[in-house]
Amino acid sequence: MNWTILNVSIPVHDLNKSKEFYEMLLGVREKQEELYQPLFQNEESVFLGDKGFGLRLFKPKPDLLIADNIQSRRSFVTLLVESIENIKRNLEVKNIKFKINDCKNDKSIKGIFVQEPSLNLIHLVENKNGFNEDLNGWNMGLDWGIHHMNLESLNVRDSIDFFCDIIGMKEGKWIAPVNKGDFSIDPSELAILPLSNNNRGLHVIKPDDGFGYRNNFAHNPSIGGHPAFTIKDLSSLKARLDKEKILYSDAKVYAMPG
């Protein structure tokens, strides 16, 4: 199954303040076109990117107000895949519940929402216009791209089996730098579904409560899931964060060669 990361969605409390923050990180783009938006209304989300690729910020609603719809209270990923029908059949065979849009008109996008075994919400969208797994932000004229999405899993192997057996993805091997940080790359604790040879793709990790402490980080990247972005000038970003007195962890080259 060919696939790539189309976008990531992050729940936020204040859309305007969050938009300002992410524009500081990724830059401002005035003209942008958003596709593949079956769940959120415009006034409830902000999209940074173009033609469906990018970052969506959304404000969760009270659960009792969304009727038969679904939402996530943590960040989730949208994957572009070459065939929804194959995935749908695999889900039905395993009796895994999912939500699929019904494509009532020509503008509808065929997509599925499903939870993998650790209950991470996964959005799968079919690409009707030919497939290019190298799709990333610079293809859309952006100055940034999505490097990976990190998914927290209490059973890494169960999650990987889901992505491989149900979605049709292929597991890879973690490529560590010479000066790797203090964390496990045992496939039962950290596994990768790669899009490249530099660890771009989906990372599935078992939460490690000592991760931040052992690596002298201000935060713990193994808990809760997160997106990682590729930008052109990390030094300038660090200077902006310092100026705004925003706390960050300088990870250097601890997990991936580069």
Residue ranges and their predicted role:
Residues 1, 4-13, 33-34, 44-53, 65-143, 151, ...:
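Vicinal oxygen chelate
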Residues 1-2, 9-55, 152-201, 243:
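Core segments of cupin and vicinal oxygen chelate
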Residues 33, 62-67, 130-136, 179-181, ...:
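A short, acidic/glycine-rich surface segment
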Residues 56-58, 113, 123, 203:
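Conserved beta-strand in the GNAT
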Residues 60-62, 83, 104-105, 129, ...:
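Short beta->alpha connector loops
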Residues 143-146, 160:
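Hydrophobic, well-ordered secondary-structure segments
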